[in-house]
Amino acid sequence: KEIAAKAAGEETCQGWMEAAPSVGFTVWDHSDRRTIYLLNTDWASDQDQRPATFIYKGKKFPVVVRRYHIETIHCADGLAVMPASNTTDILSVCKRENGWVIKVQTTGNDVVQCMNAVTGKVEPIKFDEPGVHEVFVNE
């Protein structure tokens, strides 16, 4: 148990999940970011969603994991981005002097949650039409 806790502790600086009942996750490391895939495994109850806690660089963020969805969290350079839609793609997250430029491709309306590991704040960004969008998120 101690070995597992130590290994998990080392991962939180790149983005990790606290253990939660009925929420499974896996991690994929790309050359420029980490993507966490979350799955609500509670198919027996009448609960449509389960709470979980995302940890990034010492900050903790509550997230909701919906039934029948694979949720994703993309982590890069101190910013984590979680789209609401399964068809939204986070194309890039690039650190700049006072924040990040994120490039997002949507197939319709969507909201992405930007979780700032520097300040601990969460900022939702709303997209009102499909396409490729580039937005700046302040540090």
What positions do the PLM features span?
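Non-catalytic C-terminal accessory domains or segments of carbohydrate-active enzymes
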Residues: 1-139
